[in-house]
Design a protein with these regions (language model features):
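Extreme N-terminal starter segment of soluble prokaryotic enzymes
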Residues: 1-2
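Acetyl-CoA-dependent GNAT
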Residues: 5-73, 79, 97-98, 103, ...
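Mid-chain, well-packed structural core segment of small domains
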Residues: 78-85
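Conserved acetyl-CoA pyrophosphate-binding loop and the N-cap/start of the following alpha-helix
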Residues: 87, 91-99
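Short coil/turn segments at alpha/beta junctions that flank glycine-rich nucleotide-binding fingerprints
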Residues: 90, 107-110
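Conserved acetyl-CoA-binding loop of GNAT-fold acetyltransferases
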Residues: 109, 130-140
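Conserved beta-strand-loop-alpha-helix junction that forms the acyl-donor binding cleft
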Residues: 113-126, 147
């Protein structure tokens, strides 16, 4: 398995993986919207993505955004983590998380957050999986407003 940081030329494969992820999880963004956003995402210095390859074929992806706040300074969020169903339980997700965390450390992030939806937790036991990687529940809730 090879894991590397996505380049602008990887926007297509990244978008294809994320489109599958969004469709599986029932997220609203269409494949066309995801493809368009991949170019923008990869052009932003505060963002990055990692791709995992098995035998030269994309097997998974992770996306990371960073910001800066008064409470913790530089911080990051792992926005998306997806591994193709046939490639799961082989360490691909763990490798992507390790690469993302290393990048966050290099950028000087004080902490890294991940949002686990109730559906994702019920389907994939994500809360326990992330806790096993050292993530803790903060007790904070995320409220969102569409603009």
């Amino acid at each position: 398995m090879e894991i590397r940081r996505a380049l602008p030329a990887d926007a297509g494969p990244l978008a294809a993986l994320l489109a599958r992820f969004f469709a599986e999880e029932g997220f609203a963004a269409s494949a066309a919207e995801i493809r368009e956003r991949a170019d923008v995402f990869l052009a932003e210095a505060a963002n990055t993505a990692f791709l995992a390859f098995e035998d030269g074929t994309p097997a998974g992806a992770a996306t990371v955004t960073t910001g800066f706040g008064f409470e913790t300074g530089r911080q990051a969020e792992i926005e998306d983590l997806y591994v193709l169903p046939g490639r799961r339980r082989r360490g691909v997700a763990r490798g992507l998380i390790d690469a993302a965390l290393a990048w966050c450390r290099q950028r000087g992030c004080a902490d890294v957050e991940v949002v686990v939806t109730p559906e994702g937790d019920a389907r994939h036991n994500l809360g326990a999986w992330y806790r096993g990687l050292g993530f803790d529940e903060t007790g904070r809730r995320i409220l969102s407003r569409r603009l």
